[in-house]
Structure formats: structure tokens, C-alpha cells
Amino acid sequence: MKPRKVMIIGAGNVGSAAAHAFVNQKFVEELILVDLNKERVEGNRKDLADAAAFMSGKMDISVREASDCADVDIAVITVTAGPLKEGQTRLDELRSTSRIVASIVPEMMKGGFKGIFLIATNPCDIITYQVWKLSGLPREQVLGTGVWLDTTRLRRLLAEKLDIAAQSIDAFILGEHGDSQFPVWSHSSIYGKPVNEYSMEKLGESLDLKLIGETARDTGFEIYHQKGCTEYGIAGTIVEICRHIFSGSQRALTVSCVLDGEYGQTGLAIGVPAVLSQNGVKEIISLKLNEQEQQAFDHSAAVIKENIKSI
């Protein structure tokens, strides 16, 4: 069997946490690290090699340039322009990050990259769309982590309230990985029952779904303000998406996909349910949204498109 190879571009907090998660879960044979800080990335390589030595089997961990990528199956982009400096805005951050991405992706394509791009860099949806445009790859081969972490948080919050396993919950968040995301309660269920019908049966009361949705949205910001970054949750997100791609699980995850008419939208990438296969996005699932949800989706799409204009 052909060795499965993942390249992580950006060995900061997120990239390093993702690399460690790959080592622990051991379903790829080769892990490749890329970073401008050569001393740091070499230190990471050695540290990860030590961690891998405790695991069964063999994993090759190496350092390369991003352009040395012709044999890579999945390239995970976690690069960032760094924290905002005094006087900078989020738009400044977007433009700086966009410039970094614009310097990397064309070099990778010249290097013969034919695999799948997975974007975790924020703002995820905007950078995902930029990578797709720069790469010239089919849209199926470019996706972002999108709102899968937010969706997983939503399920965790519901599970904690109801004292059940999160895996028993079918609930989704759609839209931007940011302020305009929203839960799709019309398509959410627990053991086949609407969320609050199940809650009434088990707890004798309805849950505050609005508050739960807001908490799922805001948790990432809270973590950032409390510890200065988010890393473990998004690392788990990256690894899970890659696992489903490699296994060809054909499971639907809410990831950032380039739309071509789905949900009435084009010209952007946004978080929607998508079936994953070994070629990337096999199918985008078009849910029939109610009027309020469609309005929320259109608003979220408008927010993303406005930011795309700035790059």
C-alpha cells in the first residue's frame, strides 16, 4: 500500500499540536513539516520523533520546503501572520495572512502538488477560497476545517446538558467559521427525535437552544482570550478530517467548501455538510433550510464575500 503522507505548512501552535495528534493517532506513514523558522521546525521534528518512538510501527517525520510536495497526499495549511500588533485591525491580519498564502501555494503547484489542500488558517473560509483560486485544482480537492469544530462543540454542549454521548446527536452548524455561523435546528435530532422533544422527555424542560448555539460560537474566542491561542481542538479537527479522507469513510462533516450554486451561492467557500472520500469532497449535501435559516446562511455568505473582496 502506498504510504500516506501529510504535509503541515506552519509549525506554530496549531501546526505543532496537529503534528503531535498525527503521531499519537498513527494512521499516516509520513509527516512532513514546513516552516520559515528553520531552527524551531527542526526542534519540533526531533521532539515529535521522540514521541513517535513510544508508538508501535514506524512513522517518518521530516522537514522540507513547501515546494517539495509532489508526493504529498494532503497539505494542511496552518500558517498565520502572527498576533495582531498595536493599531492593527482584523482586516490587516487577513491581508498579511493572505500574502503569506499567496507566496506558498503557487510554489507548491510549480512543485507538482496534485493532492488535497486542507486549510485551518483563519479566516478559514476566505483563505480556503483563495487557495482554491491560486491552485487551479478542482474544488473537490480544496476544503477548510470550516465549522466542524464548532459543530463538534455544539454536540458536546448538548451531550453535557442531556448526559448522553455526543455521538448520539445529529446537530449541525453552517456558515462562516466566525460570528455569522448558526445552528440548523430544523435538521437536528437525538435518537431520531427533535432536540427539545427529547429534552422534554428526559429533563421535563426545553433547552435554551439560542444560548447553546451562542456558546458553541463563542467558545473559541473565550479559549483564545484565556490562553492566547486555540490549538488542541483544531488539531483534533484537522486529524479527524484527514482520517475520513484517507479511509474514504464517506461520512458527512461540516467543512468549508467552494460552492457552485449549492444553497443559491457561488464565489465563496463556506461551511456546509460534505461527504468526504479519498479524493476530497465527494458531495455537498444541500439541506432544505427554513426561511430563517436560509436568511442566516445568505447573511453569512455575504460576510465572507465582503472579506474576499479585500484580498
From Swiss-Prot:
Q: Which of UniProt's keywords are assigned here? A: Cytoplasm, NAD, Oxidoreductase
* Pathway(s) where this gene product acts: Fermentation; pyruvate fermentation to lactate; (S)-lactate from pyruvate: step 1/1
Alphabetized InterPro entries for the sequence: L-lactate/malate_DH, L-lactate_DH, L-lactate_DH_AS, Lactate/malate_DH_C, Lactate/malate_DH_N, Lactate_DH/Glyco_Ohase_4_C, NAD(P)-bd_dom_sf
Pfam families noted in UniProt: Ldh_1_C, Ldh_1_N
Q: Which GO terms describe its molecular function?
A: L-lactate dehydrogenase activity
Q: Which domain of life is it from?
A: Bacteria
Q: Which CDD domains match?
A: HicDH_like (cd05291)
Q: Does the keyword Oxidoreductase apply?
A: yes
**EC number in record:** 1.1.1.27
Q: Which GO biological process entries does UniProt record here?
A: glycolytic process; lactate metabolic process
Q: Where is the active site?
A: H177 (proton acceptor)
* Entry's Gene Ontology cellular component terms: cytoplasm
Protein's UniProt name: L-lactate dehydrogenase 2
